[in-house]
Design a protein with these regions (language model features):
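Bacterial N-terminal signal peptides
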Residues: 2-10
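N-terminal, active-site-proximal structural segment of metallo-dependent hydrolase catalytic domains
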Residues: 12-121, 280
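Metal-dependent phosphoester-hydrolase catalytic domains
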Residues: 23-60, 151, 160, 175-180, ...
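Structured beta-strand-rich core segments of catalytic domains in phosphoester-bond hydrolases
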Residues: 49, 60-63, 109-176, 254, ...
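A fold-wide structural signal in alpha/beta-hydrolase
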Residues: 70-72, 165-167, 277
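Short hydrophobic/aromatic-enriched beta-strand-loop microsegments
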Residues: 74, 128-133, 215-219
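Active-site metal-binding loops of divalent metal-dependent hydrolases
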Residues: 74-76, 115, 169-171, 199-201, ...
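Solvent-exposed, acidic/flexible segments
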Residues: 87-95, 113-116, 133, 175-179, ...
């Protein structure tokens, strides 16, 4: 029985979209390297004691009925080379701040990037994970919402929450990878359900438009000026522009926020979280 369970977990973690098996050798090698780096990072973090969170997400307030979903996208950068507990960017200090932020903002869906296993303990108890267990860009959904997982790939994973297709992306600045990621995201779009794609795309809006992303920027639709979403740890004055994005198709964005409050720590990550309310 134990062997069967292990096999099923391995299959869930290794599931990818049908096109991934045909990835070029260079990207397959890069993916293997990323997996090894993630494993090494998780092993290093696992050596440090982590207390389980006793907090839970607050119940939805009365305003939830007036919108379809609230989505948080956040590259948390769980692991940093600085493992000194007194450091202002110590990973556990930042994850405790992340937990406070989630409880304050009360999202329905959490789309993370660069989240290694120890950091998942800081996701409040009111959420459940949807999709593969071993990827670093997981999706969490508030318990009680209808959600089902679907395709999972190296650079993204998708699920459907309350009839909305949600695609969580962690892409690259590399032009070839950006092109391939956009093509794969476009392939997830159907006429049957509205869609939202979010995450750390690592490139600016103009680049994604140039390579043919078939979705609209929620920030642009709402008339929100662009701002730098990359909060560089080492070079805080260096500007990269907005590289974390929300895109929609068949949905109405209601409000967009870039979260600059650090919730009691110096910086939660080298990216600012972004928050979007949408309606069907």
């Amino acid at each position: 029985m134990l062997a069967v369970c292990v096999s099923l977990l391995a299959l869930a973690g290794c599931r990818t979209e049908s096109g991934d098996s045909a990835l070029p050798r260079q990207e397959r090698l890069m993916a293997v390297g990323e997996t090894k780096a993630t494993a090494d990072s998780e092993q290093a973090l696992a050596a440090e004691p982590v207390s389980a969170s006793a907090s839970s997400a607050q119940a939805p307030d009365s305003s939830v009925a007036g919108r379809a979903l609230r989505i948080l996208s956040f590259n948390v950068r769980t692991w940093t080379r600085d493992r000194d507990a007194d450091s202002e960017v110590f990973w556990r200090t930042r994850m405790e701040a992340m937990e406070r932020m989630i409880e304050d903002l009360n999202p329905d869906v959490l789309c993370f990037q660069e989240m290694l296993f120890p950091a998942t303990r800081y996701v409040p108890d009111g959420y459940r994970r949807v999709g593969a267990l071993n990827i670093s860009h997981p999706i969490y959904v508030r318990k009680g919402l209808r959600a089902r997982s679907s395709e999972i790939a190296i650079r993204w994973q998708a699920c459907t929450v309350e009839g909305v297709r949600i695609i969580n992306v962690h892409s690259s600045w590399d032009a070839e990878i950006t092109q391939r990621t956009v093509e794969q995201v476009n392939a997830q779009l159907t006429s049957r359900e509205p869609a939202l794609a979010c995450g750390d795309w690592n490139v600016r809006l103009a680049t994604l438009q140039k390579v043919g992303l078939q979705m609209e920027s929620a920030r642009v639709l709402l008339g929100v000026p662009e701002d730098d979403t990359f909060a560089n740890f080492k070079r805080p004055t260096e500007s990269h522009g907005p590289i974390d994005h929300f895109f929609v198709r068949g949905l109405t964005p209601l409000s967009y926020r870039q979260i600059t409050d650090s919730y009691g720590c110096a910086k939660m990550s080298d990216h600012y979280p972004i928050l979007l309310d949408i309606a069907k």
